[in-house]
Amino acid sequence: ELLANNKEAKDYINLKLTNAKVLYVNSYKGTVNTYVREGDTAIEMRTLGIDMPVNSIISGTVKVNLAYDAGIPYLSASKETNGENLKITESNEAAEPVIATVKDILDGKYTNDLIKIKEFTFSKEEYTTGKFNYYANDGENKIMIYDKFSGIGGVSKLTEGEKYTLTGIFGVIFRGIPEVLPIKAVE
């Protein structure tokens, strides 16, 4: 299973994938972010140099490095990373998001996974003149919404106090606050 035996940063992991699904692919500041789910675990693969289209199914082995960024794991290329031992099968069947709550994300569930949070209340806080942090609230808890993927979520145009549904990746913790990255417009 994906990362079952690897909980700390480590180089040259021989990662075995069995029917792993590519959830989302994006390029951000020169880094290709590929999010993959196997079973109930997901991981970000950063710039491995292997073409893994969205919705593809991946099986096989690949040597990678495991690192952590603010508690969020990701895989990067090692000197031995290549796709020789991977079977990548393209698919038109889209991955289904995991239905999550704001509290689930605060509890660290669904890291690097495709999630959907329904009926959260939107709020924003100005941190410097004209610049805002955006939040999904459930009445007691809040997490940040960060439009990392080219502003696709349209978060800056949402109305404070209104209820929305968000589909995105829980892929960042910023200053101790979990962030969800929209992969499509917030509804």
Q: Where is each model-derived feature located?
A:
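OB-fold nucleic-acid-binding modules
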Residues: 1-61, 65-187
